[in-house]
Amino acid sequence: MENKITIDFGHICENVIVAQNGNLSIINIFNQISADNFPAIHPVLFVVIGATGDEGEYEVSVQIKKQGEEPITTQILPNKMKIPKFPAEGRLFVKFSPLVIKSAGNYEITISIMGQTKKLFFDAKKV
């Protein structure tokens, strides 16, 4: 029988704090990056992921690309997402630092776990 996974949420933010009890504090969720010029360097971007499903450990990949173009980065995470017994939720975050954005436009972040995907979006705009 194949394991079943549901990606419950994904957020793009500037920082994540993990409390001693494992709770996450997600700081400054955003969907737009502004820059004076391109290419631009965004100092830090976190992708926070929450998933539920069958208990186990799962490989996670995160890809960032400008819509309609090749990926600017893809990470297969060295640490697997651990999903504990129901009703607990697996949580994981990925840090991209620095993130080079070559041009203004619409970008998508694709999160993949066991064939399940979730897309997040952000705009890069010139100010």
Language-model regions, residue ranges each:
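Contiguous segments within soluble domain cores/interaction surfaces
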Residues: N3-A104, E108-V127
